[in-house]
Amino acid sequence: MDISRAEQRILHHLAQGGRIEIKREGKTIAEIRCFTRDGWVYPGVDLELFRKLKRKRAIRSSSGRPYRITERGLYLVRSELDNR
């Protein structure tokens, strides 16, 4: 299954140790933030992209914690060179 360039970027940040945090107002999602492993906020996540990643089972949250990448997500993400 192919993934878009934006999905690829987000999954790569998550594979390196990032997380996606959501804030809710009642049952609706009010805000979505993607944090890199260094704690910086990555601005490329919106509600549509978040739902696509959930639908593809690339990210998952357990016990109310932030969303992390799954094994399926690691399979979908193509490796990239990291300059660290």
Curated annotation (Swiss-Prot):
Domain of life: Bacteria
Transmembrane segments annotated in the record for this chain: none
Protein family per UniProt: Belongs to the UPF0386 family.
One matching Pfam family: YjhX_toxin
InterPro entries tied to this protein: YjhX_toxin (IPR018654)
Full protein name: UPF0386 protein NGR_c10980
